[in-house]
């Protein structure tokens, strides 16, 4: 990858380098031959990987960490009173947001940016897989760990870069990709966007940033995407989805042996050429993942990638960590770890569990993520667990937020009960979760962990902890 920044530029310093969005950029820079360092509050697998690549890491934020820095990169999670940000201002060291750094990298290649409330990470991974299978060797910066790479980033030598775009703070409008994807738009991140209109305008601005020779692919199944569609007429737009009106649509969907099979019909609005790709095999379950696959197929077809390559890529795709990931089995019970933390994501994940085996009993363990999200979507959370036979609620993972009155796991339990689900429990001490699961697990064929906080550690430790408790 050729970057128009001299190799002797000095250290790129990342404040909060262990974040999934920051680490990917750092990895691309270090692999491109630049000096990279960064700080974070604690160690992690991501930090360990960066160290193995030669990144200099500081644990803890301190003004002395930036004394060798030539530029400081921060994310929206970093407050302006962070000692490293304060010191950089004193020393007149340039400070840029991660979106600006990502935008600089994207200027040097043709780029595909994937935005949306849900499905971004999986769609980014799928598009990358198709391009890789077509020997296009893309550079990748993703918002999750791609299983086949064991990383969220890859430095490729090809002409294309595929990135996950973050709509949470509106910064994705700075990216100016060649190709854009919108998977869906739900009322999320209103702490920044404030209201529905601002959120919709942010997506319109994102699409408006693509050049006249680029294009955008949008999921026409989603009502809010349909709503902004009339504002997108000055760009080339391709629609995909399950809707009969989609340009790229799935048909004849069946589930067999824990895989999805479907056909895709494609209506090319430019040359009026219509054709069908038959019998696509895909190992990720759920209609939401069919939509993610359709997004990647729409991009591939527009880039003139052959259907046989598309089919091969989807057949061989082995997923993304924490996206409906089967991580282990305890006796007869499958253990699934999923990042779902929004009601729509939870409904989609629980619906997919029924596709593993229709008569399986499902135990859902949910850790609410952020008090503000629980408050803003409380009624939706109360009604999204219908496909779980039993629900156990951990305490809210605050993610730095202050407590909100009448907005905890006990309140959610009462709400879920009021919506008609009687088999729900909230726990006082999260440390008791293994003992609680041990008493219940023999009654269930599937246990699924849902949440964006540290619940993934509980999921990954479950089998070992149950074996210890059973002795």
Question: Predicted segments — roles?
Answer:
Residues 3-5, 28-34, 51, 64-67, ...:
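Phosphate-binding loop of NTP-binding sites
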Residues 31-32, 37-58, 147-151, 405:
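N-terminal beta-loop-helix "entrance" segment that forms/cooperates
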Residues 38, 140, 180, 218, ...:
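Structural beta-sheet core signal
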Residues 14, 114-116, 449:
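Hydrophobic Val/Ile/Leu positions in short beta-strands of Rossmann-like dinucleotide-binding domains
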Residues 56-68, 432, 437:
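Short acidic low-complexity segments
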Residues 3, 9-11, 15, 50, ...:
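Adenine nucleotide phosphate-binding catalytic loops in nucleotide-utilizing enzymes
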Residues 214, 389, 445:
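Glycine-centered, small-residue-biased loops immediately flanking beta-strands
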Residues 8-25, 35-41, 320, 344, ...:
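Active-site beta-alpha connecting loops in nucleotide-dependent enzymes
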